Structures are given as structure tokens and as C-alpha cells.
Amino acid sequence: MINQDSIVALATPSGAGAIAVIRISGAEAVSIGNSVFKSIKNKDLTKQKTHTLHLGHIVDNGKTLDEVLVSVFKGPNSYTGEDTIEISCHGSTYIQQQIIQLLLRKGCRMADAGEFTLRAFLNGKLDLSQAEAVADLISSDNEASHHIAMQQMRGGFSNEIAKLREELLNFASLIELELDFAEEDVEFADRTQFHELLNRIEFVLKRLIDSFAVGNVIKNGIPVAIVGEPNVGKSTLLNALLNEERAIVSDIAGTTRDTIEDELVIGGIGFRFIDTAGIRETKDVVESIGIKKTFEKIDQAQVVIYLFDGLKFKASSSEFVSEIEQIKNKYPLKPLLIVVNKKDILSEDEVLNITQKLENLNAKLLLISAKQKIGVEELKNELLSFVNTGALRNNETIVTNTRHYDSLLKALDEIQKVKFGLETNLSSDLIALDIKEALYQFGLITGQVSNDELLGNIFANFCIGK
């Protein structure tokens, strides 16, 4: 499947900038680069050592296009495992295109999306899960997602899967051997040891599967719905959290007619805050649509903030309590923060009345002033406490990829079938079938088992120059 042609693409983001990097990889990469490069020291790139830098000019039919710095990487000691050069030129879009067009005329072709990393995988520089981590690393926008992607790219997840696969494969070989000597009625695989191995594999698989609940939201941002009566300061709170004017702030009830989303990183974790239209009963058609969207957003949220105006609590306490209970009853498993706004102008008696009437609702209660930004940092810390960051702190493997999660679920199902087969004295040939399916799922994760369609789907999500 490895193409022998040389590919070229812009490795830096498209558009003008201080510099741009153009990457070429393939059997003829260095010779093609050498044909358009004139070194200031008259060096021949094809005769240079790997991992060297060379200053010179890109020349097209005697015309100098740019002064550049060329990096030479000889295979297999390169990212792709092939001969590779990278041309660092000035970031003019005109210069970029002129150099790329020149390289195409000299024998390169434009790289497909993710083709450089695909070649790295096909040449054994990365396994499939590591290759996918490259894309995650590029798209990471907070400390946690960066940490997870780096760990996976360095082989943390791959090594864990490879170890499970190797141990299971060793026993599978013994089971297959028993089938070859079926008439002898002998057991080469110690059933007690095999059962212990299956228990270990099951434990690891369950831990990895459970980690996806954390990993998936870290990768995509943890959605937090800010809900409550209209005009209680939800937009002001959102702006205080984000330190910018994002939502429409007005004194007219129901101003936030639609859901508004923005992102914030707290303690290295990405959160997506969703300001909604409130949940009061209304006859206004437009506002009713917004309220419907509020409940849709609560469905999607991992955490719910119910915000109300502390000055209105005395007159409307029964309504507030009813709405909080409605949310708790409809979403009993979602973490709920009850946040009281306008703390800065509440009397001690008002604060006492609020805390006494809400203390039995079994939800965390915070008093803040969104306008004065009082209590905002405490709110951020509470949000962070809802995220299970123990696995991150302990440097454990965390699964973020849906494809991996699916294969882990299927592998666990097969392992449990094997355990059941052992416990019920199922024949070795049937047990062997379930073992093979578990091994197949492990192989899908690392790429030891793959096909063109699978690889095409994975690498199509990469940028062209990677």
C-alpha cells in the first residue's frame, strides 16, 4: 500500500505569516529538493548527512524565488520513515504557492490528508493509536487534552494493549496446540493460570472503558448548562467566567432568546459554558422555543448550574425550590450547583433564610455576585471538583477515542465469553474462537489488523501537511 512517489504539502497553517514550512517525503524527496535548491556553500543535498540544515535559495529557471533554510532527514530516521526535506521559507502565500508549484513540476504530487502520518504508520514509525494521537495533539487546546495526547503518542496506551494482546496470544497458542492433539486428550494451557490472566485482562479493560467517560469530555470540553429564571444574571455570570462581553446583558426579562456557548480552561480542563433562556412558564412563543432548548442543553450537559436572584428569593422561594427539584428529579445523576446571585447586596438575614430553605436539597450552594465577580473563583473550583482528575494526576492511561472505546467494549465481551467457556468446560475449539475475536479487537486498536477503508477514514481527518 506504500506509494513510492514523493509527496509535498504545506506543513504550517495556510495563509500569510512570518515563515512557512513546506514538507516533501518519498524516495526522490532529497533529489527533487536538490534540483530547486542552490546552497550558499554549493552543497549537494543528496550527499548531506541526515538531520542537517542548509541555507540557500529556491531557484526556478535562474529566477530566485526566496531565501530558505532546508532541513534534510534521511529515512528511516525521519517522521515518515522515508527521505524527507522541509523547506522553511518566508510566509508569503505567493512564495508558498510558487515553491509548491515548482516542486510539483519537478515530480512531486500533492499529499492527501494525513498522508505523511499514514506513511509513518505503514513504515512502522507509529502504530495506529499513536498516529491518531498526533491528530489529537494538534487539536488539543488545554493542558489535560495535551497531556492525554502526548501520553498516547508516546505509546502509553499502545503498550498497555500490546501487553494484553501478547499475554492472551501466548495462551491462545497453547489452546491451538491442544486442538492439534485433540485425540491425545492433553491440556497444555493451565486453566487456573489462564483464568487469572482473564481476570487481569478484564480488570484492565474495564478501567480503560471507564476512563472514556472522563477522556471524552476532556477531549471535547465539559459542557456546563447555566439555567434559571430569565434576567437573574446568567449572561453576566457567563461574562464574568469568560472575562469578556459574550452574551446580551439587559434589564428586560427573557433577553437571552437562544443558547449561547463559550469555552474556558480551568485547572487545565476545558469547559463549555452554555447560557440558556431560562425555564419559567411563558406564553411568549419565541421565549418558549428558548426554554425547550434549555432542557435540550441540560440533556447534553455534564454539570448544571441553577442560578437565581437572591433578592427575589423571599417572594419566590417556593417557585425556585420547585424548579430546582424539577431539575433534580429529571436529572438525578447530574451534578447540580445552586448559585445565588447578588451576594454583595444581600443582608445577613436574607442569606440565612436562603441557606436554611435550600440546605435539604442535597446540592452544593454558592453565593456570588456575578456583576462584582465575587465568588467566581470559588465557583470555578467547584466545577473542577466534579471532574475525576485522579487518573490524570496518577498518569494513568485515559481513552478519548470512540473507535478505541468500541473495540475495548467488544474485546471485554469476548474475554467474558472465554471466562464463561472455561467455567462451563466448553470445548477448546469454541474458546479459541472467542480468543481470536478478542485478539482481533486489540489488533484493530494498534493497527496490527487494518484495512484500506479503516485507514482512509482515520487519516482523512488529518490536515494535509501532517
UniProtKB/Swiss-Prot annotation:
All copies of domain TrmE-type G, residue ranges: 221-388
GO biological processes: tRNA methylation; tRNA wobble uridine modification
Cofactor(s) it depends on: K(+)
Transmembrane segments: none
EC category name: hydrolase
GO terms for MF: GTP binding; GTPase activity; metal ion binding
Sequence positions that bind K(+): 231, 250, 252, 255
Chain positions recorded as GTP binding sites: 231-236, 250-256, 275-278
Residues where Mg(2+) binds: 235, 256
Cofactor note: Binds 1 potassium ion per subunit.
EC number: 3.6.-.-
Ligase in keyword set: no
Keywords in alphabetical order: Cytoplasm, GTP-binding, Hydrolase, Magnesium, Metal-binding, Nucleotide-binding, Potassium, tRNA processing
Job of this protein: Exhibits a very high intrinsic GTPase hydrolysis rate. Involved in the addition of a carboxymethylaminomethyl (cmnm) group at the wobble position (U34) of certain tRNAs, forming tRNA-cmnm(5)s(2)U34.
Cross-referenced NCBIfam families: mnmE_trmE_thdF (TIGR00450), PRK05291.1-3 (NF003661), small_GTP (TIGR00231)
Similarity comment: family membership: Belongs to the TRAFAC class TrmE-Era-EngA-EngB-Septin-like GTPase superfamily. TrmE GTPase family.
Protein known as: tRNA modification GTPase MnmE
